[in-house]
């Protein structure tokens, strides 16, 4: 893996190297977010994949690609798998979780809209390098109940997103059951569990602060691709 595919985060008394084989993300898993996107809440989980190459950790910057004119933030609770999971029932799902952290599902919204209009997958809008910031630490699954945590995001000090994980349509055990009946989840794989309402555009020079109760907060600068190219 290249260096952007591996992020080292504090975990227990040491560190954990985040090296997923895949990032499985949820679309429209908060009802109000589904509505702000012009949809009704789904009847079953809507999943898509983000590439591990999109991962960055604290201290890195989110890069706005020249190809997109509208890049949005989405703050999400990330579940990191601790054991190989295949056909796991919801009743046993928590036994397979290593821990929790925060992930941003950065999205090129204009490219997503174009892809939807053509009936194409969303990968082009979700897969750019730096489009999966993660941090600030991994919290042991035994030390945190993820069922009702405040989750939020500020841009330049102003609150954009604020919700609670209890507002998820499909809860973590349901997600693990659903996903593991489709694909095997390997140790280290990440499930990004969806975002509360309030998603919005990012611009060059913005400063993002994202937080989840019990995990902490992380901050990232936003830079236009043109500003870092020679």
Swiss-Prot record:
Gene3D superfamilies: Fumarylacetoacetase-like, C-terminal domain
Highest taxon, organism lineage: Archaea
Keywords recorded for this protein, A-Z: Metal-binding
GO molecular function: acetylpyruvate hydrolase activity; metal ion binding
InterPro entries cross-referenced by the UniProt entry: Fumarylacetoacetase-like_C, Fumarylacetoacetase_C_sf
Disulfide bonds: none
Binding sites annotated in the UniProt record for a divalent metal cation: 74, 76, 105
Family: Belongs to the FAH family.
Protein name, entry field: Uncharacterized protein PH0643
Organism: Pyrococcus horikoshii (strain ATCC 700860 / DSM 12428 / JCM 9974 / NBRC 100139 / OT-3)
């Amino acid at each position: 893996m290249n260096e952007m595919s591996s992020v080292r985060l504090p975990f227990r008394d040491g560190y954990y190297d985040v090296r997923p084989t895949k990032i499985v993300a949820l679309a429209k898993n908060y009802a109000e977010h589904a509505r702000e996107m012009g949809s009704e809440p789904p009847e079953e989980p809507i999943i898509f994949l983000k590439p591990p190459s999109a991962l960055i950790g604290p201290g890195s910057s989110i890069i706005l690609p020249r190809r997109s004119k509208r890049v949005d933030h989405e703050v999400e609770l990330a579940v990191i798998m601790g054991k190989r999971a295949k056909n796991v029932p919801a009743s046993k799902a928590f036994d397979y979780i290593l821990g929790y952290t925060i992930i941003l599902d950065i999205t090129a919204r204009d490219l997503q809209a174009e892809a939807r209009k053509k009936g194409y997958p969303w990968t082009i809008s979700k897969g750019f390098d730096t489009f999966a910031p993660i941090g600030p630490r991994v919290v042991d699954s035994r030390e945190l109940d993820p069922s009702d945590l405040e989750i939020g995001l500020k841009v330049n000090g102003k609150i954009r997103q604020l919700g609670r994980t209890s507002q998820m349509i499909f809860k973590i055990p349901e997600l693990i059951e659903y996903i593991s009946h489709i694909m095997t989840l390997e140790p280290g794989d990440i499930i990004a569990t969806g975002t509360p309402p309030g998603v919005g555009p990012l611009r060059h020079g913005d400063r993002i602060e994202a937080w989840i109760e019990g995990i902490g907060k992380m901050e990232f600068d936003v830079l236009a691709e043109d500003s870092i190219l020679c």
